[in-house]
């Protein structure tokens, strides 16, 4: 998949945070990135990779609840499970395939074993858009130390398994091949590219380049994606599947999209093995902020995160990007002043995203601690319906700061702030 040059692509990132005057400055225009012509295709892996990492994997009823929420969110593809792993998985894959809408790709994972591939096909064949997903290692380390076979046998296994899967799906479905541990194949990148080409030659419709274990910086992985993409046919549909072992999965996935990846494999709440998979919400909003048209229903993100947290029995970290309870709070006086002065603008001084966009019930939240200034006092009481001036807020701020310090530097409640405000009013 060779990339369009900037001169060939008229769609340039439209960053709403930058004025038109700034856009015209030479140094800024040089940093603009062409927006890919293809829309991102979100292939959700919550029901497979996310589910297999849970302490208590979901039952069919819970899987159906997640499945329907994914449809509400608007993902274009759903990997419903690993059909050959056990009978419960098979039945879940079969049932979810039977209720899938016409416009959503339904996938089941399988190892490169014909018997397992056949089970996957039996489970999903009645879906309107079925896809068999085959995974097999391509990194030298895994081939030598886990498979313990020759590279030639690896290529032969890929060829046979993909061809067999293609013979099953025919023109009705698709085949995806994942080169497991692609992110660890820098030392044998030519071999990995050959493996993907063989998969394509035998009927693969999508090739997936996973960062199965995140060990290195995003730039290195993205460079590997570019290198392989340039060796494959121009119309190759490249997929990315990144894990979050070092906390960089979102960055890696976003940059891989700009490097040519069409399909982005992500999970709700970032669920997945070890530190999880790429978080769907983070990738979606990051691309949106870069001017990319993202075909998801953003307004369902917040409710989706709460539902997934409840069903997975995994609490949402209060500082989790976008969905954490505390990520819209501001406590520093400098920050609060900037928030207060830009609340009415589309771009906030300290606001990375619009809370309403993702369905959060409230926007910027200003709290008072001993680090807060008069802007916090003014905004808190003004929002509560009190008639207060900035001058009065300035007089009240040191009183509240002293109380906060006396109480162990804790945050003050609205009621505590109001009590001191009323005392000040009586003294005026």
UniProtKB/Swiss-Prot annotation:
Homodimer. Its EC number is 2.3.3.13. Belongs to the alpha-IPM synthase/homocitrate synthase family. LeuA type 1 subfamily. Coiled coil: none annotated. Its cofactor is Mn(2+). Induction: Expression is significantly repressed by leucine and moderately repressed by isoleucine. This is 2-isopropylmalate synthase 2. Pathway: Amino-acid biosynthesis; L-leucine biosynthesis; L-leucine from 3-methyl-2-oxobutanoate: step 1/4. Residues 40-302 form the Pyruvate carboxyltransferase domain. One of its GO terms (cellular component) is cytoplasm. The gene is leuA2. Catalyzes the condensation of the acetyl group of acetyl-CoA with 3-methyl-2-oxobutanoate (2-ketoisovalerate) to form 3-carboxy-3-hydroxy-4-methylpentanoate (2-isopropylmalate). Has high alpha-isopropylmalate synthase activity and low citramalate synthase activity. Signal peptide: none annotated. InterPro entries: 2-IPM_HCS-like, AIPM/Hcit_synth_CS, Aldolase_TIM, IPMS_Lepto, LeuA-like_post-cat, PYR_CT. Is missing the C-terminal regulatory domain compared to orthologs.
